[in-house]
Amino acid sequence: MMKYTIRNRHTIGIIALVIALCASCSFNSPSIAFPKVQRLYKHTVEEDFVENLAVFAVFQDADGVNDYKELLLQENATGLEWRLHRGNTIFLQESGFSQHEQWVGSNTFAYPRGAFPAGAYTLTLSDLGGNTTSHVFTLQKPPRVTARPFQFTVNRETWQIHVKNSSFCCYFSLVMLSADLQPLRTHHLGKKETETITGSLQELIDFVPDACYIQCFSENQDRSIGFFSAPIPVP
């Protein structure tokens, strides 16, 4: 009787383990929604520009957003790959989203030789069960950037944007940054068609008293290209 009991307990333990493993498996394939791609140009102190590619998409999975494993970006012509694991993925939640959908991606993809070439790219999302879903998109030829499309200045009372190239300057935002240049708050100015835009610096500081830097961000008409000014210390 004792041997039977031990064997029976052992069998029950194996069954419980199998059930636990099955419960942790991912049975549903994920899907991609609302993919967004944008070339980002950062103006450095050395009067130069650095390009990064921002790639985001909504990860949808019936098993929940915690089933997300990684994002893979591939240049189809060369096979070059950029891989994001959970640890270096940016997760963004949006009002109205369920527990089965979440924005995933990054704005720091960098090409090894300057700007990302025009052509086809494949975005692939995978879950913990090894299920994948892909989306192919096409990048247009990168713009020829030789000068800042706008000038951003700050004094103790006001901030000012002076537009130099309107083709790159349709929508504007102001980003308040921490001492280590992490974004604290983004103030969207919306679509602007005037050559000069001015506002109160104090109004921005009132929202984020601990901000140490301020940065301007512009986007073109279809928001496929964005420009960051160099961060300016808050006076």
Each predicted region: which residue ranges?
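Contiguous beta-strand segments within globular domains
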Residues: 40-61, 66-68, 151-169
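Proline/serine/threonine-rich low-complexity linkers at boundaries of modular beta-sandwich domains
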Residues: 25-37, 133-143
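Edge beta-strands of extracellular beta-sandwich domains
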Residues: 132-140, 222-235
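Solvent-exposed loop/turn segments flanking beta-strands in beta-repeat/beta-sandwich domains
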Residues: 62-77, 82, 164-182
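Aromatic sugar-binding surface patches on proteins
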Residues: 89-110, 191-202
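Short, aromatic- and glycine-rich surface loops/edge beta-strands on solvent-exposed regions
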Residues: 115-129, 174, 205-226
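Low-complexity, Pro/Ser/Thr- and charge-rich linker/hinge segments at domain boundaries
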Residues: 139-162, 233-235
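Sec-dependent bacterial lipoprotein signal peptides
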Residues: 1-25
